[in-house]
Amino acid sequence: MKKVIVTGGLGFIGSNLIKILLKKKYFVINIDKVSYSSNFYNVKKFSNNRNYKFFKIDINNDKKILKIFKKYKPNAIFNLAAETHVDRSIDGPESFIKNNILGAFKLLQAFRKFVERYKNSLLIHISTDEVYGDVLTGRSKEEDAYKPSSPYAASKASSDHL
């Protein structure tokens, strides 16, 4: 059975990804630090599923993250863990820098150590369209220049470049 880790799995997108992965018969490990945007209701339907495990861990804790990687040996890791509210980022950018930049860095460092031994795993980092700034016409493309207009967008752009 393939194993997948989802960080930020108590959020809206993360919990829906977990739902899809469980339907496809993956073993899913949900890692979430549990913050203002976490919602246990999102995972209530599958919290007793034998192919689902939840761990309350901050991605800044690279030692615990690496321990989980080594224990479960995931085929893939989806990083959806992030502070996500634009207005909150303006009022207090520090947690966005800590979680979205440093947290992504710590997760990447743990992943680098993990893949030294387990080479067949991949990490998929999830971003946001906010990194492109205000798109007035049409849609943004991946090749477009970054123009973040909030601390949230800047923190996600920074993590993309790691």
Q: Where in the sequence are the language-model features?
A:
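N-terminal Rossmann-like NAD(P)+-binding domain of SDR-like oxidoreductases, especially those catalyzing
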Residues: 1-162
